[in-house]
Amino acid sequence: MGLVRSEACGLVRGSANVARRTLLSRILACTLTAAGVLAAPAAAQKRAPHRFNLPLARDLAADAAASARDRVPIFLFFDRYDCPYCERALARFVVPMAKEAPWRDRALFRQVEIDQPLPVVDFAGNATTHERLAARYGVSVTPTVAVVDGRGNVIGKPVVGLLTADFYAAYLEQAIDAGIGRLRGTTG
């Protein structure tokens, strides 16, 4: 048997059929790999959301303008799809708070999905994703709440984890109050 030269395969021992099979198997492997890479983000986007959710962070630059105008902080709830504590925090505390007077008027409530490549405009007006935004804040534990100003600076102590459920609402209220105080210059 002689050597067969193929541009895609290099030198292959055997007949032209072996070269064709090798070439086809490489094309198939590349195609399947590409299909898997392309399908992964689509599959991630198709996952069912939690039953209770805040408005997703989509345009934080616009939220920053509203924050400055109304002199209220931005409440970022960092969440993960498979986090049962996030579901509990959203259902029992965060979503009711966001809908309830006076809290709905004291902060802009936004949700950030740390395990999703969802598009978002950051505070500087740059396109990024929820995953990258969470990484910028160093968030790896969920749920995490960060109260931020219109530049995206954390202005209150972050609330990490569900902590003690009996006191969770109080921790959230303290974080919002501290953020309002910092924005309005009434606390240090």
Predicted feature descriptions by range:
Residues 71-82:
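Short active-site neighborhood of thiol/selenol oxidoreductases, capturing the structured segment around
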Residues 87-101:
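Typically the conserved alpha-helix immediately C-terminal to a functionally engaged Cys/Sec
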